[in-house]
């Protein structure tokens, strides 16, 4: 169970329409449209809903899929995994442990050292650049 619980009205007041659709309604942004899919700045990618430090820029890589991709979470305890059988597929959904926000999915076709590809919606993230 998420540590941070808010009403639907509170989430709607905090997030813009796209952030709400992605994080609270398990939406997906179109490939190559999110603000972080091609970002190369150093920093920490935080949950847009609660600020949890989910991924570091050092683990981000270009997977060619059009979404920010990471091979390792900042702390595995901050990411929860769930079986997702929507759209006739079986995938592994990843959510923020602290607030339950839908982040994206994890696949087993990533690079070393983990072989994993955390395919994350930009709308679920906020980049805190190093030194700021």
From Swiss-Prot:
Keywords: Metal-binding, Oxidoreductase, Zinc. One of its GO terms (molecular function) is peptide-methionine (R)-S-oxide reductase activity. The active site is at 119 (nucleophile). The keyword Zinc applies. Its EC number is 1.8.4.12. It comes from the Bacteria. Binds 1 zinc ion per subunit. The zinc ion is important for the structural integrity of the protein. Disulfide bonds: none annotated. It is an enzyme of class 1 (oxidoreductase). Pfam families: SelR (PF01641). The keyword Metal-binding applies. One of its GO terms (biological process) is response to oxidative stress. GO terms for cellular component: cytoplasm. Its cofactor is Zn(2+). It catalyses: L-methionyl-[protein] + [thioredoxin]-disulfide + H2O = L-methionyl-(R)-S-oxide-[protein] + [thioredoxin]-dithiol. NCBIfam families: peptide-methionine (R)-S-oxide reductase MsrB. This is Peptide methionine sulfoxide reductase MsrB. The lineage of its organism: Bacteria, Pseudomonadati, Pseudomonadota, Betaproteobacteria, Rhodocyclales.
């Amino acid at each position: 169970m998420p540590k941070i619980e808010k009403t639907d009205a509170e989430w709607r007041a905090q997030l813009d329409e796209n952030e709400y659709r992605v994080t609270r309604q398990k939406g997906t942004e179109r490939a190559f449209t999110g603000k972080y899919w091609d970002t190369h700045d150093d920093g920490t990618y935080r949950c847009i809903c609660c600020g949890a430090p989910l991924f570091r820029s050092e683990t981000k890589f270009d997977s060619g899929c059009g979404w920010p991709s990471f091979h390792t979470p900042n702390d595995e305890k901050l990411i929860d995994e769930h079986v997702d059988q929507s759209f006739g597929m079986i995938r592994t959904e990843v959510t923020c442990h602290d607030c339950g926000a839908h982040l994206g999915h994890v696949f087993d076709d990533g690079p070393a050292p983990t072989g994993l590809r955390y395919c994350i919606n930009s709308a679920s993230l906020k980049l805190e650049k190093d030194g700021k």
